[in-house]
C-alpha cells in the first residue's frame, strides 16, 4: 500500500515539476510561441468558417504578397478589378499555379498586369480564386461558396488542374469528404492532423484564440501550456487508436503523411484505382459547373512539370503519368469543355529551352514564363 502511495505521489510530483518548468520556459519565450498565429479575430473567424466546408483557404501570411491592399475575403478569392457594370465575369480556379497570378513568390506581378490590361479593353471582370493544393473536389465546393455567400456568378471559368492534384485527391481529401444525397457538401479539415503540414490549422486556431483573446501574460502562458498538454494528449491518443486498435481503412489512411513524395508518387507509380478515382472527381466537378446556368463556358488548363521532359529525369525518377492525358480522355465525353493542354504544346516544342522557366520546385513556372499564358 505504501509503495503504491509513494509511486502515485512521485508520479504526480514529477508531472507538477515538468508543468512548472514548461510554464516558466513558455512564459519567458512567449513571443516566439505565436509566430504563426492569426493577426486578427476577423481573419481567424473567416478562416475557420470557410475551412469547415472546403478543407482550407489561403494562409493569412499570403496576404502580404498580394498586388493590392488586402481584404479579409482575399483569404478565399481576389477581385482583380471591379465587377460593377461588367458584361462578363471570369473566374480563375486551381491550386498555387493559378494563385500565382495575384500572389507571385518573386513580387513580379506580370500575370496580374497582363490580365488588368485585357480588362481595360473589354468589359470583363476577373476574380482569382486559386489557392494552394486546390484540386477538383475543393474547386467544386468553392463554386457554391462564392455563389451562395458572395453572390459571385461567373460566366466563364478557367480551371487549372495541376499534376499534383491526383495526389491531393487520393491522399488529402478522399476520406474527409461529406456527401448528402450523393452530392458533395464539404471536405472536412483534419482536426488533429497526425503530421506537420501547411494545412494543420486546428493547432494554429487554438494558439490564435489564446493570442488574440488573452492580454494578461500570466494567464496567456497558463492557457497556452494547458492547450499544448490537451492537444498533445488527444493527438497521441488518436494516433494510438488508429495505429493499434482501429481496423477502419479510413483511420489507417489518416496515418499517412501527405508530404511531397507521397503526393508525387501517383505520377511516378500510377495505380489504375487512383487514376479512376481522380477522373471521377474531375467528372463530378464538371457536372457541378454544368449545373450552373450562369456559366457559359469552361476552360480546363493543364501544364507539365519539369520531370515530364525526358532530358530532365533526375536520379532515375521519371513521371509515368501526365494528368493532361487524363483530362483529354475525360473530355471525349464532354465536348462543351475546352482543354488548353500546355503539356502537349510545350513537350512537343523542340525550340523550348525549359531549363530557365521554372521556380526552384521545378513544378511552377517563374513569373516571366507564367505571364506568357495570359498574353493572348
Predicted features and spans:
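Membrane/wall-proximal cationic-aromatic binding patches
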Residues: 29-118, 251, 264, 349, ...
Amino acid at each position: 500500500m505504501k509503495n503504491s502511495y509513494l509511486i502515485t505521489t512521485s508520479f504526480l510530483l514529477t508531472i507538477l515539476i515538468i508543468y512548472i518548468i514548461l510554464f516558466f520556459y513558455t512564459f519567458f519565450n512567449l513571443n516566439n510561441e505565436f509566430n504563426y498565429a492569426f493577426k486578427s479575430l476577423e481573419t481567424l473567424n473567416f478562416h475557420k468558417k470557410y475551412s469547415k466546408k472546403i478543407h482550407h483557404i489561403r494562409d493569412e501570411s499570403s496576404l502580404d504578397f498580394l498586388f493590392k491592399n488586402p481584404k479579409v475575403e482575399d483569404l478565399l478569392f481576389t477581385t482583380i478589378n471591379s465587377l460593377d457594370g461588367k458584361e462578363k465575369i471570369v473566374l480563375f480556379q486551381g491550386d498555387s499555379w493559378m494563385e500565382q497570378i495575384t500572389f507571385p513568390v518573386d513580387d513580379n506581378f506580370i500575370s496580374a498586369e497582363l490580365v488588368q490590361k485585357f480588362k481595360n479593353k473589354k468589359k470583363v471582370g476577373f476574380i482569382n480564386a486559386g489557392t494552394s493544393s486546390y484540386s477538383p473536389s475543393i474547386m467544386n465546393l468553392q463554386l457554391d461558396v462564392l455563389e451562395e455567400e458572395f453572390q459571385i456568378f461567373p460566366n466563364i471559368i478557367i480551371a487549372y488542374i495541376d499534376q499534383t492534384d491526383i495526389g491531393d485527391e487520393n491522399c488529402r481529401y478522399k476520406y474527409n469528404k461529406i456527401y448528402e444525397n450523393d452530392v458533395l457538401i464539404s471536405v472536412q479539415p483534419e482536426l488533429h492532423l497526425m503530421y506537420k503540414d501547411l494545412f494543420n490549422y486546428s493547432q494554429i486556431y487554438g494558439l490564435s484564440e489564446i493570442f488574440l483573446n488573452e492580454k494578461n501574460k500570466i494567464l496567456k502562458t497558463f492557457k497556452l501550456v494547458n492547450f499544448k498538454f490537451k492537444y498533445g494528449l488527444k493527438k497521441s491518443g488518436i494516433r494510438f487508436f488508429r495505429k493499434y486498435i482501429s481496423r477502419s481503412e479510413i483511420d489507417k489512411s489518416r496515418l499517412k503523411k501527405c508530404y511531397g513524395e507521397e503526393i508525387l508518387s501517383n505520377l511516378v507509380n500510377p495505380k489504375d484505382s487512383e487514376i479512376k478515382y481522380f477522373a471521377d472527381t474531375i467528372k463530378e466537378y464538371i457536372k457541378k459547373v454544368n449545373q450552373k446556368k450562369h456559366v457559359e463556358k469552361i476552360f480546363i488548363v493543364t501544364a507539365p512539370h519539369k520531370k515530364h521532359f525526358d532530358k530532365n529525369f533526375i536520379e532515375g525518377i521519371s513521371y509515368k503519368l501526365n494528368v493532361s492525358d487524363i483530362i483529354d480522355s475525360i473530355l471525349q465525353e464532354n465536348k462543351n469543355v475546352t482543354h488548353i493542354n500546355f503539356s502537349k504544346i510545350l513537350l512537343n516544342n523542340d525550340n523550348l529551352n525549359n531549363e530557365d522557366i521554372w521556380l526552384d520546385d521545378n513544378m511552377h513556372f517563374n513569373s516571366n514564363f507564367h505571364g506568357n499564358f495570359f498574353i493572348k
